[in-house]
Amino acid sequence: MFELVWTPTATATFAALQAKAQASIDHRARSKRAKASKDEGLFKQVVKCITHLRSNPRHPGLQTHEFHSLPHPYDKAGKVFEAYVQNRTPGAYRLFWCYGPGKNQLTVIAITPHP
């Protein structure tokens, strides 16, 4: 099991997604609707992606692969990886991460719609 380290950008994005999902849950409870919103679904998918990433960064569902357009935050020669939060969706979300800074640590660099 890996320990996660978050960049300020990733922390802010995660908090914003969580707040939108909670607002949707509250609104749904007030209006007595049963169907979950897109914001709730997206947050659930992000949490699932993070869970898989912590337990196994090579989990087949993540479809993890190297991403060359972002610099590694700790090591210029290090690799940055992209994991799928969503698939086959317009503007599908991706999670960018790298190994480090310490042993058994992963850094979540960003959570963004597909670039």
What are these model-derived regions, one by one?
Residues M1-A92, G100-P115:
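Basic, Lys/Arg-enriched alpha-helical interface segments
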